Amino acid sequence: MMGEQSGQTRCYYNMSIEQFVPADHPLRAIRPLIEAKTIRRECRSLYSPIGRPSIPPEQLFLALVGGYLMGISSDRKLVMELQCNMALKWFVGLGLDEEPWDASTFSQNRRRRFDQSGILEKLFDQTVKRALQENLISRHVSVDGTLVRANASFKSFVPIEVAMDPEEYKKRLRSSDDEDHQGPQDPGNPTVDFRGQKRGNRTHRSLTDSDCRFVSKGTLGTGAYPGYTVNAVMENRHRLLLGLRAEIFRSSTSEEQGVLALLDRAKRRFRFKAKSLGADKGFFHREFIAGVFRRRVQPHIAADTRGSSRFHQRVRMRRRGEPYRLSQRCLKKIEELFGEGKEFHGLRRFRRRGLLKV
């Protein structure tokens, strides 16, 4: 017999939010690893001792982490998911009858607390330290870099203006006033036509994001676009990132200085000293190899045909051993991390502007 839906709804329900989260849900395994007391201790100095109680900082942090884990790259979409996604609501600690916050809550807390204090970076370091204590981190690392598009367009780049003397500035103002009296030269929607003009990082800057640059891998057939360089250091056993940092693009070899800085940071903050370092051909440069040797790390770098210095020769000699082969096999792991970040976690293009905020 065909059933039919009852038109009467129940007024009372006896249930818990736990019932809506499957036992094998990934967020269930991650939630016990995040300690609310640690977050509150790190954030205590960012709040006033008087006034109206704020949203608990651990809930804000859990909402951001949960959004990134689920590939949510918009604050408004995150608020919508907090309303209807029971697993995310349970992860953050909201009850069934609790309303999520406004989207501006996240942007205002980033601007007032998170950007300047570096609190998110400190919490990331706490995760790495805990992994070191549990002996989950190998002493063999892989390094790589990628280019991430900035939240700026080609048309936002204008020539860098040099300082003018007062008379020249007044003359320029008078000429612009004359042009205004003559009427608009391009009525309607004004466009920026830069065809035929030579534009580069030495002569142009973006009005939208002054820290971004024209970035390119330096290979034939690849055009430049506004973006940043993102470097990472990964341990080879469990694909844990020991360091990740966005930097202003300097040249096609700017990844090298960023990677060495991340190695120094890991040694300074975690007392972590790598034994070997795997990298692709893009790092087969004399200065980078010399920097790796100075840090007493064995470079397992893919060798190129160019380069005849003693540093290049020492790297080529290591290609014959099994450790080199294993390090090269692990390179795909860090490339997969970048691929997953761009595909699922919004790393393909930054939403915010400025080096401090990206």
Please name every model-derived segment.
Residues 22, 26, 51-59, 71-74, ...:
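Secondary-structure capping and boundary motifs in well-ordered enzyme cores
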Residues 1-35, 174-194:
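Charged, often Cys/His-bearing segments associated with DNA-binding zinc-finger transcription factors
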Residues 2-5, 9-11, 30-34, 39-136, ...:
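Basic, low-complexity intrinsically disordered segments
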Residues 166-167, 179-182, 286-356:
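Helix-centered, glycine/charged polyanion-binding patches within enzymatic domains
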